[in-house]
Structures are given as structure tokens and as C-alpha cells.
């Protein structure tokens, strides 16, 4: 059987809406795919299983940029609405827009500096169309204003991590050919030096005035203030670099179109509204922190409160402040929190270290939040269950990548199945490209979405190779679909799938099981080269502190391989049991809590 569909053009994210039936597949038109992909395609279901959302995304009017443009309408109620809270200060949508326009107008002036070095040339407002603008700032109103100012000027925002070492910053700046680097006063000296080394200009982001120090007249700017060149929908707007866990970081180019479609999709799926108040403690150079916790909330006119960095005590305290035990909700109560699994592990550890009274007030407060989500890496079942027992929240797991942001989610309302990432979001199509030798329906997950990236920066061949002939993005993740139609992620084909004695094993499945052991606080499983079996299941364990102390007091090792396998033999098939065990103090994680297994495996094998 062959299904044929035509991709029709659409204007400003007007999505195709038609009914799905048993023998038709709805494909969203998308100018976001690389231009090498045809507008009309046919595909066969040979070797594939097809799945799609039960309904298509119903677009709302407007875009993220128009939210801020509306802040300057006389009839708008958004101008004075608080958009950002940071460092004890509040910033309205109007003040953010005013600052962004001020930044865009600075590009008109030739008053930037790069320390006297020769620079890459640009000519200001309008001619910034397509120019890459690096932004280095802590989570703040200034960061948001820097991104918006870049977009108002037709530029492409490239968020850079404060945690990057100089060599990595220079690599990203040179790879993306950044012509202007924006930063704040607290990082100015370092960033001036780096800008000079890369040949980019440097400019300070002007401080954003806060809501108590200045009131913005909502009608002070004319509409033509927003009419800079470059805001065409399919123009590049954002380059986010991949984390590099499976190879060299690549620049992923998103357009205004893909950004708009994604924020609308998330707003609808998770019911973000202007009544929501987000507590944000994620990095802003990854899509989780950018889209789920910033762009989509701002599109919904929510309030985003930045914590300068992840703090166990700070998060529990902020929740308790929001919902005191006397049940009197405050005016600025947190309603939504999203984090990575490692954060929830640390929050559980912090909770367990509290006295009984503090535990009661903390659990009471956490239960009052509307929504808690987890992503960026697999959520171990024990963590999900323990969090639910403490807070009453079954964490909402979803599935995303830099290339398409979010594609699947457990439902906001309905069964959230542990160990799964739910079903495709409205407007997203997914399929499993099955391995011919696998009888369990396991294969590579492929995705088509209106939020798909445009291309990998300066890597046309890699971009082309990343798509199937019918325009689906090949994620590189192995997965299957369970009996409820929910997707189960088994891990990266290159890092989490081990080949042991003829079996293909999921490291994530084994990790999730080992984490149920009371001695195991964290764990990483990977396959190390083995002459007899191809790869050996190797477990790296970080012990739970109390269990570790107890065993040390007894002059015993924290845990032995025999003890671990003896405990796990009733939970895992014999060929899935670890044959090697390493006890470490900590795991090397990146800013999103991920372990670079490819590099870790290489390092361990080089030591042998």
C-alpha cells in the first residue's frame, strides 16, 4: 500500500486542517524543510509503521513577535503586564519591547568597538538581515531584550553559554560567523577579548528599566518602528548549537516560522495562559530553556521568573513562598515548573534532608502548582514515582530535540504513562523506521513537524542526509510504540543501544531498573568493547550517601557486582545484567544534565 500526499503552501502558519481516517495521513505544509526536499512526495509503508496525532494543531492568530508589537497598541492590555522577574525586579512587556527597539536602533550607529582590531563589517538597521548576532547574558530581561532587538533588526540570534570555555565560544562564534557580540556589563571584559579574537564587534546590552522605575507610554512608537527588513517568516531567526553528545556540535537554524509554530503548539498542548507564572532555572542556549520555559510562555503572555542558577533550597523556598501552609495564595505564586531529571533527583535529595515540618510545608506547596514537566533526558521510573509520592505530581514527560524542539508529549489531561514520552503533538507526524532484523517493532524514530529546523549551518550535505526521501527528519533515536500508542525512547542509536552477544539492548532500560536499587543514587550504563560478546554491559554507579556511609562503617564495599546482579536477576533478562561495575563519586554531565556517553566510552576504552 502506498499513501500519497501533497504539501500545500501556507501563509503565516495557516495550517492545513482536515480529518484523519484509517487510510490517510495529514502532512503539514512546511517551507522549513531544506530546499532539496520536493514539495510533493510519495512514500511507502514498507518497513515502516505510521503514527500520527488524533487531531491537528489549530493555529491561533498572531506570532511571538506580534505579542511584543501589541504591547505598544493603545488598546493593548499587555503593555504594563509583567513579562519577566529577575533579581527581585519586574519588567513589563512594554519595557522589554522598548529596550529591544533601543537595541535595534543601536545597530544604526557605528559606535561599537572590538578593541581596535579589524572587524567583520555590517551596516546597521535593515542590512542586518541574516547577520548572526551572538548573545551572552545570564537569564535576565537583558537576554530577552537582546534576542528581540536582534529580530527587530532582521538579524539571527545565536545564544551562547556562559559556561562555555573560551575555545568553545570561539569555535561557535567562528563557525556561525558572528559579526556582533552582545553582552552585559558583568561579562563585558571577557566578551570584549573574545570578540576581538573572533573579529566580531562588541556592544553592551543596555540595562532594561524595571516596572517600578519607568512607565512606558504604550502608544509612543509608530508601527513602522517594527518594519525593519528581515522579519520574513522563512528567514533564519535563531541558531542553537547541539550539545554534541553524539558528535561535534552543529548549528541548528530555526526560522520565524518554526519558532511561531512551536510556541503555538506548546501553548495549546499544555494550556499556557496569561495566568501562568513560570519558575525558570534552565540554560538559555538549549531549546528546553528557550522554547518550553521562555518563548512559549511569553507568547501566552505568562510571567517568567528567572532564578540565576539551579538551587535546590531556592526552588523549594520559592514554592513555599507561593503557597504558605495557611492556604493563602500569594499574588505572584508559581504555577508551572519544568526541569531535567537530574534536577528532580536533587530536589528529592533536598526534600529528604529537611526536618518533618519543612517537608510538610514543602510538599503542601508543591502540590499546588498547576503543572510540572521533565525532559532533555530520560526520566527514571523511580524518580517519577518518588516525586509523585512527595508532591502528588506525575511529571509530564515529552520528547524533543534541537532540530524540531518538541514533537511528542504525554497528555496534560489523561494518562501519563511512565517510561514513555506520549504521542505526537497536534500537527506533528512520526513514524518508526523498523530494523528488518528486529521482531519487536524497534527502529529509528522519524519526525515531520511545522517546527522543523531549516538546515544545519554551513552543512548542506549533513542536512540532506538527515532527512528521508519523503521529508521526515531522522532523529537517530531508537524507539518503539507501546500498546497504547505511546512512544518509548530506547536511546541514541550511537550511544544508548548496545550490541551484546547478538542482542540489541537499551542502556536506558537497564539504567532505569538499576536506579530502583536502594544503594544507587545515579547510574550510567554503556557498552564497552568485548572480544567475546561484542560489547559488555558496564554500569557506573554513584551511591546514595546514607547507604555509602553505612557500608563504609561496616568496612564493606558500597556494592559489589555480584550483589547488584543478584538483586537485578528477577528484573532483567540474564543477557541484560551488567558484567562490569564501576563506583564513582559523580558523573560528568553537561548543562542539561546529560552524560556524553560517546566521549565517556572512548575515555574508558583508552584506559584499558
From Swiss-Prot:
Cellular localisation: Cytoplasm; Nucleus
Is Nucleus included in the keywords of this UniProt record? yes
BP GO terms, sorted: fatty acid biosynthetic process; malonate catabolic process
Which top EC class is named for this enzyme in its record?
ligase
Q: Might you report a single GO cellular component term? A: cytosol
Instruction: Write the Enzyme Commission number(s) for this entry.
Output: 6.2.1.76
GO MF term list: malonyl-CoA synthetase activity
* Induction behaviour: By abscisic acid (ABA) and osmotic stress.
Instruction: Summarize the pH-dependence annotation from the UniProt entry.
Output: Optimum pH is 6.5-8.0.
Tissues of expression? Expressed in flowers.
Q: Which residues form the signal peptide?
A: none
Mutant phenotype after disruption: Strong defects in growth and development and most of the plants die before flowering. Viable plants have a greatly reduced seed set with a low proportion of viable seed and accumulate malonate and succinate.
The chemistry this enzyme catalyses reads: malonate + ATP + CoA = malonyl-CoA + AMP + diphosphate
Q: Which InterPro entries match?
A: AMP-bd_C, AMP-bd_C_sf, AMP-binding_CS, AMP-dep_synth/lig_dom, ANL_N_sf
> Could you tell me the keywords of this UniProt record?
Cytoplasm, Fatty acid metabolism, Ligase, Lipid metabolism, Nucleus
Q: What else is known?
A: Plants overexpressing AAE13 show increased sensitivity to exogenous malonate.
Which family does this protein fall into?
Belongs to the ATP-dependent AMP-binding enzyme family.
Function, as annotated: Malonate--CoA ligase that catalyzes the formation of malonyl-CoA directly from malonate and CoA. May be required for the detoxification of malonate.
- Record-given protein name: Malonate--CoA ligase
Its taxonomic placement starts with: Eukaryota, Viridiplantae, Streptophyta, Embryophyta, Tracheophyta
